[in-house]
UniProtKB/Swiss-Prot annotation:
Entry EC no(s): 5.3.1.24
Family: Belongs to the TrpF family.
Keyword Isomerase included in the entry's annotation: yes
Entry keyword set: Amino-acid biosynthesis, Aromatic amino acid biosynthesis, Isomerase, Tryptophan biosynthesis
Reaction catalysed by this enzyme: N-(5-phospho-beta-D-ribosyl)anthranilate = 1-(2-carboxyphenylamino)-1-deoxy-D-ribulose 5-phosphate
Main enzyme class: isomerase
Protein name (Swiss-Prot/TrEMBL): N-(5'-phosphoribosyl)anthranilate isomerase
Pathway: Amino-acid biosynthesis; L-tryptophan biosynthesis; L-tryptophan from chorismate: step 3/5
GO molecular-function terms, A-Z: phosphoribosylanthranilate isomerase activity
Lineage of source species: Bacteria, Pseudomonadati, Thermodesulfobacteriota, Desulfovibrionia, Desulfovibrionales
UniProt xrefs under InterPro entries: Aldolase_TIM, PRAI_dom, RibuloseP-bd_barrel, TrpF_fam
Amino acid sequence: MLIKVCGLTRQADVDLAASFGASMCGFIFHPVSPRCVSPVQAASLESGSMLRVGVFVEQDAEEICRIMAEARLDMAQLHGRQDAACARAVGAQRVIRVIWPARYCHRALLYNELQNHADACACYLLDAGLAGGGSGVRLDWEDLNHLPSPRPWLLAGGLSAENVGLALSRCSPDGVDFNSGVEDAPGQKNAQKLAAALAVAAKQKGNRYLS
């Protein structure tokens, strides 16, 4: 099971994520986000063996690559209108493509969208709402049950210790993404909430892993 903790801004929280078994740590590079960090700030946060993920909303491929190098990132989570060409310019195996299932009125349309990006990403992140992230809004998990995804996918959207077990029983993601559900305030993780959430997630077995 891939476990990602996103919206990190403090070394203490990065250390907590690593100690509780997270495999990925996320840094947000969107100026309007209360969890936004600069490339210099992200670079200063030591993350051990966790994969370092940058969240990008408005940047183009050139800017994404520049920030990735400066912030020592392994992967780019494309959270905006970046198209497949942008993803390929960044490097498909370095891309997490965000998809919002609520935009699609039928599972077939969602599946088509997944297929459209299959050769331009390493995995998907399925988030709640119609855009953005970190809102705490949950997905309808049962709608994602037996989703025929061509790539591994992570579930996001208001996950916490209280609901992640139920979420994983309703659908079968290859990973989970925690953010607002393990915080006291935006960018400030709560050690108890984080430990409890990751303990539940760590008991689950994902189907696939990033190559």
